[in-house]
Amino acid sequence: MFELFLFIDPLCKACRNSENTVLRISEDIDSKFKLQFIPIYNLKVVQTDYCNSNNQLKKRLSSEQLADLYKNVVLDYKAALFQGMKKGRKFLTEMQDRLLTDAMSYSDEMAISIAKDCGLDVDMFVEDRRSNLAKNAIKKDQELVQNMKIEKPASAVIFNCENSKDGILTENIEYSTLFNACCDKNLTTEYLQDALSEDNLNETKMKHFRIIK
């Protein structure tokens, strides 16, 4: 079984594309595959276009408006996740598409409309979306960001749950790279450690991977 954590800027088109990439992999791979989208929620991500995606929201909105938008979107996403991973991911991607592609303005009505479209229990969603439970879930996500040494959005950490407790981090979110990594049962942290050794580094194709303890 593989587990993949994709760390994202929730209001970034490049990260939205990365989500599509890993969703394709989860559908195509034969192994059991657990996938989580983890929003990075801090001041740097709110204010910086890390992925150079020509982020119009960050150009158009004031710092205060951006901070409010990020807070609302991340809280809504965590509330949706309480009703299941798949529904939560569907909620997030629909919210991103409306904000980033359709250039719609965020509102409570939009969030509730998306919740209905995604088959969520709307009353439960409304109750959870500004709850302490959702806020604590965000805090746990940010602890995960720190523990896994994530430096920027559009980073993924892969765990081969059968072979190692350590994870493999990459900032190269491409289909072939991630698909091959998840299919290669020999891609253990021990193998990667040897491939990234000083003697082998110039020849290895694994330069974009790092080991996360």
What are these regions (language model features)?
Residues 1:
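Active-site-proximal cofactor/substrate-binding loop regions of enzyme domains
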Residues 9-19:
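Short, thiol/selenol-centered motifs that function as redox-active sites or metal-ligating centers
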Residues 18-103:
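Structural alpha/beta surface segment adjacent to cysteine/selenocysteine redox centers
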Residues 11, 81-84, 130:
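Short beta->alpha junction loops/turns
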Residues 5-8, 21-26, 102, 106-213:
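C-terminal cap of thioredoxin/glutaredoxin-like
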Residues 13, 44, 165:
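Flexible, glycine-rich phosphate/dinucleotide-binding loops
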